């Protein structure tokens, strides 16, 4: 079972102040896609996918009085416990202690991007991902890396197993 979480903005053409018939609950939100403020409704969507069937589990209008993290955490608490090996798919925004641990309680492992400022504890030493990657490159220990080819491009991948801030026994590639 895959649980897919993402947020989006349904853009509107005019702000309420300029519209003849103002749109209720529309607001300005930062669009990472457009890299600027965008006027419209922002929603957090959750899809469940299993055996080729994908269903909309919920779509919640974003309310600025409650963070997106808390909204997704609440969804995780309400979602049924996974009966089989299951995964949460999300972007780096949602890969945080509250969300990951809430989904772990429901039997979901998390697959998502990790921000470079995320804290790891390699060999018990606290450092961010960017710092740790630099140390691995400095060490020039090729045997620590696995060469992976994706669409003809080659990447060196390192597997970290250990703790993140507030998340135990994580695997980071």
Task: Locate each region found by the language model.
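Active-site-proximal, Lys/Arg-enriched surface segment
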Residues: 1-51, 153-154, 158
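Single, function-defining residue in the core of a domain
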Residues: 1, 12-17, 51-173
């Amino acid at each position: 079972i895959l649980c897919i979480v993402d947020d989006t903005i349904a853009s509107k053409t005019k702000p309420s102040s300029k519209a003849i018939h103002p749109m209720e609950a529309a607001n300005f939100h930062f669009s990472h896609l457009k890299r600027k403020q965008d006027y419209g409704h922002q929603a957090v969507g959750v899809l469940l996918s299993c055996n080729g069937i994908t269903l909309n589990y919920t779509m919640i209008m974003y309310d600025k009085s409650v963070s997106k993290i808390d909204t997704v955490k609440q969804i995780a608490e309400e979602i049924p416990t996974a009966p089989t090996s299951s995964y949460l798919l999300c972007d780096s925004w949602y890969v945080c202690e509250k969300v990951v641990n809430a989904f772990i309680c429901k039997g979901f492992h998390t697959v998502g991007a990790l921000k470079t400022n995320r804290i790891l504890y390699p060999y018990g030493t606290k450092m961010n991902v960017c710092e740790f990657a630099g140390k691995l490159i400095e060490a020039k220990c090729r045997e620590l890396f696995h060469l992976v080819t994706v669409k003809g491009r080659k990447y060196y991948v390192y597997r970290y197993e250990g703790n993140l801030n507030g998340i135990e026994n994580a695997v980071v590639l």
